[in-house]
Structure formats: structure tokens, C-alpha cells
């Protein structure tokens, strides 16, 4: 994957939401970078207000990404995989009981945008709903008050599956 493709994906994923609860975001993106030209493999947090990646772990993350995604190899085989960390406490303070739903709504909207951006760039994408919550939080060195994982995602070059062709 090229840096231009990754930039386009991140820009598309972080466009402000137009919803009744729009305002500050509750979901933080963490990227497991495996194969992005010119970007060292590692785990990065994405800061949309600065359009900046901050590396928090160095080295090959393929085994970790797959393992954290309940052993799903596609998280390790993709060019980049994502953990979406939702700040449920802040959402609850802002929106009461509905905050929990708004965090998941935001993660779903980000996932939809990741699908659309990947498809527009000729890449494949898939949401991953199975992951180890506590292991992800520990791996990313997040304290409980920093949020919890709500969704995983992977983007890379598609591998055609003849079983799916009609």
C-alpha cells in the first residue's frame, strides 16, 4: 500500500460525522502497519486533528494483530489493520446512557468509510467483530479510563476467491 493510499483512507475515515450527537469524537484509531511503503512496521495511534501518526510500538505486528483479532490471519496479512478504541466514559458524561450507542455508531460509521475508501482505491477491506478486549487494551498499553476496543478492521490487496464467483 502506498502512503498516499493510507492518507486517503485516514482522511476519509475521519471526516466529521453529521449526526444528532456530532461533536467531539469518541473513537481513537490505532493502526497495525504491516506493509505501507516508507512507513516502518509497528503500531501507530492516529491523531486526526493533526493528520499525524504516532508510533507506539516498533517492529513486525502481523502475529500480534492476528492474535488480538481472535486468531484471524487476515488482520496480520493485510497491509494495515485497525483497532478502534471507544471512550465510553466520556461519551456517557456527554450523552448519558445513549453514549454507549453513539460510540458504536461512530465506530460503524468509520468502518463504513474505511470500506468505501478501500474500494475506491482498489483495495479489499473487512470489518472484524471478534477480538480479545482486555488483550488489546494491554497490548496498546491503555488504561481502562482511556477506553475499550469496540471494532477491528483490516485493509489490503484482495485475494480473489473462486468459490465466491458466480
Where are these predicted regions, by residue range?
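N-terminal amphipathic, basic helical "cap/leader" segment at the start of enzyme domains
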Residues: 1-80
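A short alpha/beta connector and helix-capping loop motif
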Residues: 147-149
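C-terminal helix-cap and adjacent tail motif
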Residues: 152-166
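Active-site-adjacent "gating/activation" loops or surface patches in catalytic cores
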Residues: 72-100
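Small-aliphatic-rich amphipathic alpha-helix that forms the alpha element of a beta-alpha
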Residues: 9, 29, 82, 98-138
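Short, glycine-/Ser/Thr-/acidic-enriched flexible segments
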Residues: 34-37, 50-51, 60-61, 87-90, ...
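Hydrophobic alpha-helix feature that most strongly marks membrane-spanning transmembrane helices
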Residues: 14, 34, 87-90, 112-119, ...
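Short conserved micro-motifs at the rims of enzyme active sites and ligand-binding pockets
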Residues: 40-43, 92-96, 162-166
